[in-house]
Amino acid sequence: RIHIIHLEELLYLQAGGDYVTIFTPDGQYVKEQTMKYFETHLPPALFVRIHRSCIVNTEQILRVELFGKENYQVRLKNGVCLRASNAGYKLLKERLSL
């Protein structure tokens, strides 16, 4: 079965082995593709790779929180929390002009 997912429906993507799980408000979809593929094909103004295993839709971000001493997590509007690496946090700050 083929599901058409519009960019605005995409909340975030998470890597798991050779697959990427795409999260939308309506459910999860697994795609046999690499994170690098999505990173290069999704619009950089809208999607940021915040961790080696996670790409997030910046329009879905509610806030960025300090998690522990030097770690950050990204809280989405739907309540999901995603860990951000230090490099991912810096990239997110640049893209959001923080």
How would you describe each model-predicted region?
Residues 1-83:
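Conserved binding/recognition cores within well-folded domains
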Residues 76, 88-98:
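Eukaryotic intrinsically disordered, low-complexity regulatory linkers and tails enriched in Ser/Thr/Pro
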